[in-house]
Amino acid sequence: RRHTRCLSDWSSDVCSSDLEALRQALREEMARDQNVYVIGEEVGRFEGSYKVTQGLFKEFGPKRVREAPIAEEGFMGIGVGSAMLGLRPVVEIMTLNFVLVAIDMVVNHAAKVRYMFGGKLKVPMVIRTPGGSGKQLTAQHSQSFEGWFANVPGMKVVAPSTPADAKGLLKAAIRDDDPVLFLENLTIYNLRGDVPEGDYVVPIGLAAVPRVGTDLTIVSHSYGTVR
């Protein structure tokens, strides 16, 4: 849908990094819907480990950018419960590896609530988390579990590969009425590309086709599409 390099001089788009596109999506959705809030470790005054939430605490205050202790299962549960009550939490987990600490809340609660209550309750929450390998991090910080979660009924998994998709898919995930695992990749956080201004939303489940051919189909996601 969008190039992984900037062509903004010839278009109405804005040249942004993946990080900036994510931040723009969060800011726009929080301004658009008072029910959207962010919760996670160091997301407030420290502005997040990778600065995705930079400026949001100052703009929206502590009620909508909520600091959490190092207790992933606890604040994941807060996200699930508040989503069931009508809010739209964006839960930031510092690394995908730490989602395992809260896996009971994700798999047995967030993903199952709609089925357990016959469709009468929904869990409109987003779990934002970076992952990927090749960054010379520890063994517990270098794993990719998206395949696990893609097999969980009721859970949607999103893995953008360009800044435009980062913005458009995050906005779509926040508006979705089911839980979405939004997987970011550390390697492409600083990747720059053209990002449409305004209310740009990319539908979840619609694959981007960067190159059309006739003989072979290669399917990939996240960093694998830009290597």
Please describe what each predicted stretch is.
Residues 21-25, 167-179, 190-227:
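Glycine-/acidic-rich phosphate or pyrophosphate-binding loops and their flanking alpha/beta elements
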Residues 12-179, 183, 187:
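Thiamine diphosphate
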Residues 9, 150, 210-211:
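Short, flexible turn/loop "capping" segments at secondary-structure junctions
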Residues 7-8, 117, 208:
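Short secondary-structure boundary/capping segments
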Residues 1-14:
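Single conserved hydrophobic/aromatic residue that forms the stacking wall/gate
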Residues 5-6, 156, 218:
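Short, flexible active-site loop motifs that bind/organize anionic cofactors or intermediates
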